[in-house]
UniProtKB/Swiss-Prot annotation:
Its main location: membrane. GO terms for cellular component: cytoplasmic vesicle membrane; dendrite membrane; early endosome membrane; endoplasmic reticulum-Golgi intermediate compartment membrane; endosome membrane; GABA-ergic synapse; growth cone membrane; late endosome membrane. This is Lysosome-associated membrane glycoprotein 5. Residues 1-29 form the signal peptide. The chain crosses the membrane at residues 236-256. It is found in: Cytoplasmic vesicle membrane; Cell membrane; Cell projection, Dendrite; Cytoplasmic vesicle, Secretory vesicle, Synaptic vesicle membrane. Belongs to the LAMP family. Keywords: Cell membrane, Cell projection, Cytoplasmic vesicle, Endosome, Glycoprotein, Membrane, Signal, Synapse, Transmembrane, Transmembrane helix. GO terms for biological process: establishment of protein localization to organelle; presynaptic modulation of chemical synaptic transmission. InterPro entries: Lamp2-like_luminal, Lysosome-assoc_membr_glycop. Plays a role in short-term synaptic plasticity in a subset of GABAergic neurons in the brain. It comes from Bos taurus. Glycans are attached at N35, N53.
Length: 280
């Protein structure tokens, strides 16, 4: 019995060690993150990199702002009125994250963890007439804020921490193996734990890739958002039309010049019949 008990204890101890090793390995992997926002020429844009096993597995560049409604007492101290806090993601934020085969996560904390942003990315496969195609998307956003923080909130009623979550989110949909790029502003609505409050998240200057990064610190081919493609078309269309119009004018002038030259070389028939006798 003693030998059997020792064997069982040995197996249990090995399991515990393996679990501890797995936990420590995961924690170390999550800590391989870098905030490279100082490299950005845009002071409002942040750059975050998650690295596992010595290579980049998630890269994210974006500017983020949160519009947060909150209640304050009116001047009569009886009624409540709603104010608005504009909270921007600042440089020097703390960042965490991890990468998986079909699920990756980015977490950002700033202002002494008064604010926290969590972004969850999923990769999934779909059957299409052309065969199976894989895409990735932003599937969940969570924003935690503390309305007792005095920089952005002034005399908030029932001040404290609140959590705002997205619901049924499917944003930034991108073909697998590509990065998502969008300069235009995009808004995501988040339902807050503060009753009847909706937080608006505004993203801009976005460039993200949470899966299948081939080169270290280098984005793969860009998949541009429809808004950027439309704006690019609107910018290039006048140029194309101008070139076509210029070409039409040049062709018209050339044809006119050739026609004028040909008619100038023809014999001119006098209109005065009395001049016919001088011809020949």
């Amino acid at each position: 019995m003693d030998l059997r008990r020792r064997a069982l204890l040995g197996v249990d101890g090995l399991r515990v060690l393996l679990m501890l090793f797995h936990t420590v390995t995961r924690i170390m992997a999550e800590q391989e993150v870098e905030n490279l926002s100082g490299l950005s020429t845009n002071p409002e844009k942040d750059i975050f990199v998650v690295r596992e096993n010595g290579t980049t597995c998630l890269m994210a560049e974006f500017a983020a702002k949160f519009i947060v409604p909150y209640d304050v007492w009116a001047s009569n101290y009886v009624d409540l009125i709603t104010e608005q806090a504009d909270i921007s993601l600042t440089r020097g934020a703390e960042v965490k994250g991890h990468c998986g085969h079909d699920e990756s996560e980015l977490q950002v904390f700033w202002v002494d963890r008064a604010y926290a942003l969590k972004m969850l990315f999923l990769k999934e496969s779909h059957n299409t007439p052309k065969g199976p195609e894989a895409t990735w998307k932003l599937s969940k956003v969570q924003f935690v804020y503390d309305s007792s923080e005095k920089t952005h909130f002034k005399d908030a009623v029932s001040a404290g921490k609140h959590t705002a979550n997205s619901h049924h989110l499917s944003a930034l949909v991108t073909p697998a193996g590509k990065s998502y790029e969008c300069q235009a502003q995009q808004t995501i609505s988040l339902a807050s734990s503060d009753p009847q409050k909706t937080v608006t998240m505004i993203l801009s200057a976005v460039h993200i890739q949470p899966f299948d990064i081939i080169s270290d610190f280098v984005f793969s081919e860009e998949h541009k958002c429809p808004v950027d493609e439309r704006e690019q078309l609107e910018e290039t269309l006048p140029l194309i039309l101008g070139l076509i119009l210029g070409l039409v004018i040049v062709v018209t002038l050339v044809i006119y010049h050739i026609h004028h030259k040909m008619t100038a070389n023809q014999v001119q028939i006098p209109r005065d019949r009395s001049q016919y006798k001088h011809m020949g």
